[in-house]
Amino acid sequence: MRWSKYLLLLVVLCLLAVGCRRDIRIGGIKGEEKVGPDYSLRDDPKARARMQYREYLRLAGDRVGKNDLVEAMKFARSAEKLDSRSPDAFTMQAVIEGTGGNAAAAGTLYRKAAELAPQRADVLSNYGAWLCGNGHPAESLVWFDRALADPQSNARAASLANAGGCALDAGQNERAEQNLREALELAPDNAYALESMARNEVLHGRYFEARAFYQRRLAAAPATVSVLQLAIQIEERLGDRTAAGRFQQRLREEFPSGATLNPQG
């Protein structure tokens, strides 16, 4: 599932969070605050349905975490039955299909979610991420542009990082650097933006700058096959065989199957 590296963690985490908290708060009211007479959500069928919808999504996310994809899909489809116009049920189904290796099915569901929520930056960026990771980086930029149309979006930094990385894949290097630098201004520890900036510096032959970005990337998040391979490539270009050897050893020890992969793959 190569394209999963582009997905907004924000989206998945927010999606799961809708049902993770049992103390559901309405209208921002919490604790002992009151604005009217007490009543029970059990008296409101719409409120009950909304709570059940959130619970189905929570259960689906829980099952994904346990790799029980069959049960996860049952819960996600139950959520869809309660609210077929909400993008979150389709996003959850897309996550499940992607986790199971069904990239085409996941793409269809991400697009469905995007069509249902044309103003939601997180949902639009997820479909862009799927397009980018499945060989359509130029097309993905259209969806990232839609996601970035809202300057106040909570997903802006992640959308910029995704757009920058995918612009790099599309050969749009000037746009890539602009988007990535904007992303890092908003979120200096964004792992994907840092790794993409390291790739960008390599493309321009700026290996010392590339080293600085991969080092920041390794400090920001756990190592992956791709960033270790990138570090090896950069250190070899800088002539530091000792450093390259250390990363090769890490790659063999932490990701045995990744030791033979193409560094650009």
PLM region spans:
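TPR alpha-solenoid repeat register
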Residues: A89, V123, R156-S159, A193, ...
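Structural marker of alpha-solenoid helical repeat scaffolds
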Residues: R48, L82, L116-A117, D150-Q152, ...
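Terminal, low-structured helical/coil segments at or just beyond the last alpha-helical repeat
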Residues: I24-D44, R217-G265
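Canonical tetratricopeptide repeat
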Residues: R58, M92-V95, N126, L160-N162, ...
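Canonical positions in the second alpha-helix
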Residues: S78-A79, K112-A113, R146-D150, E182-A183, ...
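N-terminal leader/linker segments that initiate helical-solenoid repeat arrays
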Residues: C20-R77, K81
